[in-house]
Regions:
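Eukaryotic intrinsically disordered, low-complexity regulatory tails and linkers enriched
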Residues: 1-31
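Alpha-solenoid helical repeat scaffolds
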Residues: 103, 147, 151, 187, ...
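Eukaryotic alpha-helical solenoid repeat scaffolds
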Residues: 134-222, 227-231
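Hydrophobic residues within the alpha-helices of tandem HEAT/HEAT-like
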Residues: 107-113, 148-159, 203-214, 247-256, ...
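Amphipathic alpha-helical scaffolding segments comprising HEAT/armadillo-like alpha-solenoid repeats
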Residues: 34, 40, 80-87, 131, ...
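Alpha-helical solenoid scaffolds in large eukaryotic transport, assembly, and signaling factors
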Residues: 19-177
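Helix-loop junctions that connect tandem helical modules in alpha-solenoid scaffolds
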Residues: 45-54, 88-99, 132-144, 186-198, ...
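Eukaryotic acidic, Ser/Thr-rich intrinsically disordered low-complexity regions
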Residues: 257-295
Length: 295
């Protein structure tokens, strides 16, 4: 999906969507998100790590962030320079430690659970601060990767942010043509194929969240095969029942939207039948997949 035009941007209070529109867009099943974030602790740690290293304007940005997350003011509380401040924390490795970035990202992951975070995301249309950082996920420390995976996963909590993750509008970054959906795909694949158990688990949650999105199939045209291949490779890593269910749900969805996925399962495997008997819900998904890809 392309990014909305200025006329299509949500209102500042996020209340102008019609009820019928909301009902059509809400996924049939709730997204899987990471809510185990102590935001007061995260902000306290962030303030200590930033002490003496930021400008007066950036101190104001931190105060605005506190208003947004603790005092529950709307995202309107965040000034126009908020993302400039975030970008400096994420990218200035000389001034800020990995721990600073981790607490910043975990703070963003908490903010991602709010429906009006979409206002912040739309402010990033020009500079792509967030998606460019995500594109480099394999270059960040393991802890930064885990925090960013949580942020990505939590953006699926509400309709607007989850749609933002799947925008197909392109831009150039480090000699590559990328888009939100391609970056989201890269994050999902990186996580699911990681040796880190935490990343694997969140990766399976992200894939599940992608699968339950009610979007036009054209959105997945360029990424369905890549995601399916990652899932098949993931099947060889002894996943648990929850992870099997999530990734089978995604595989079934990608089978619906891309005929190439059927060929990939047949040629590369393994066939999901190897998980038969894990649970009733897993068996049901295996039946659905086997109708298109006989074992």
């Amino acid at each position: 999906m392309s990014e909305p035009t200025a006329q299509q941007q949500p209102s500042q209070n996020g209340k102008e969507r019609s009820k019928s529109t909301e009902e059509k867009e809400i996924p049939r099943e709730p997204a899987l998100v990471c809510k185990d974030i102590d935001i007061k602790t995260e902000l306290e740690c962030l303030v200590k790590l930033l002490d003496g290293k930021i400008s007066k304007e950036e101190e104001v940005a931190m105060e605005e962030l506190h208003q947004y997350l603790i005092e529950d003011d709307g995202s309107w509380a965040l000034g126009d320079n908020f993302l400039v401040f975030v970008q400096r924390v994420l990218r200035d490795v000389q001034a800020f430690s990995p721990d600073t970035r981790i607490h910043m990202i975990r703070t963003l992951a908490y903010a991602a659970l709010k429906d009006d975070v979409i206002i912040i995301l739309h402010q990033d249309r020009r500079d792509h601060t967030l998606m460019n950082f995500a594109q480099d996920i394999d270059k960040h420390t393991p802890e930064e990767q885990q925090a960013w995976a949580m942020f990505t996963c939590n953006l699926f909590e509400n309709v607007g942010p989850s749609e933002w993750l799947l925008y197909i509008s392109e831009w150039e970054y480090n000699g590559q043509t990328i888009s939100n959906i391609r970056v989201t795909t890269k994050v999902a694949v990186h996580c699911i194929l990681s040796n880190c158990p935490q990343l694997k688990n969140i990766g399976s949650m992200i894939l599940y969240n992608i699968a339950i999105k009610e979007v036009k199939t054209v959105v997945f045209d360029d990424v369905a095969v890549e995601l399916a291949m990652a899932i098949l490779q993931f099947f060889q890593s002894s996943p648990n029942e929850d992870q099997i269910f999530r990734t089978l749900k995604a595989l079934a969805r990608f089978l619906e939207v891309s005929p190439d996925v059927q060929m990939i399962i047949q040629m590369i495997g393994p066939h999901p039948k190897q998980f038969a008997g894990k649970s009733e819900r897993v068996d049901e998904l295996i039946k659905i997949i086997s109708r298109k890809v006989p074992a």
